[in-house]
């Protein structure tokens, strides 16, 4: 009986061990399948999230490379809505404006672009007058050019065979034919512009390289019309100009020392980042939040100056 008891005990032990091992294997298989299912659901969610921001096709709009090597897009002739009935007093009345076709830079002028111009024309680089942090954080070749006067922006565009856009051209390039508040629509969305309205959620503390926000492009595929640097335009500033502006191709009031700045900047509020928002600045002002881009008439052949 003693040996028989030992044998039975051994059989029970072996059988129990087998059952335990099978149970562990089944549990591990269950965990593995569950992890695979979780991974699959994460991938599906990621695809769903990315597909919620549809890829826009801008190929319908004609582009060209200007003489200084920068891409421009042709904004077609036609009407658009300018101003805002819900904005500041100088944005009213909201009205329809008609523009002939024009070209505009798809990206803001970079510091590298401006440095090339300054070197070829023997001009000094813009100086940063006031900045609370290390200036090197603003000075990178790939960042947007800033801190130049209105006259210096005009000189760059002339050197490149272009001009500054009019205020109306700038607004149409940003809004399209409708009256959207921001380049992508009516609701401000983090990650679509370098505008630190909610801290640094856009990924940049100060400036950003022009063209960093693919989902923040305007209806014509133009980058940074909302945020990064505000931009000089050709027009002088008149608070009441919209009330007397012509329907076709408005070019602003009589020249004066106050010029219009558009687009908001990297440190603006949602209100100031709106495409209809108008700013006024003395033409000799230099500011780390102000840069520019250039435009040209469709029928004008760019000057060869910049390619020499």
Say what each PLM segment does:
Residues 27-56:
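Ser/Thr/Pro/Gly-rich low-complexity linker/stalk segments immediately outside membranes or between
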Residues 1-15:
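N-terminal Sec-pathway targeting helices
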Residues 59-62, 89-93, 278-283:
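Short, P/G- and charge-enriched loop/turn segments at secondary-structure junctions
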Residues 81, 86, 124, 131-279, ...:
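Functional-site microenvironments in short loops/helix caps that host divalent-cation chemistry
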Residues 9, 64-128, 148-151, 227:
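A short glycine-rich, aromatic-capped structural motif
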Residues 288-302:
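Short, structured beta-strand segments at or near domain termini in extracellular proteins/domains
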Residues 54-68:
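A short, compositionally biased domain-edge/stem linker segment
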Residues 39-40, 74, 306:
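Intrinsically disordered, low-complexity segments enriched in small/polar and acidic residues
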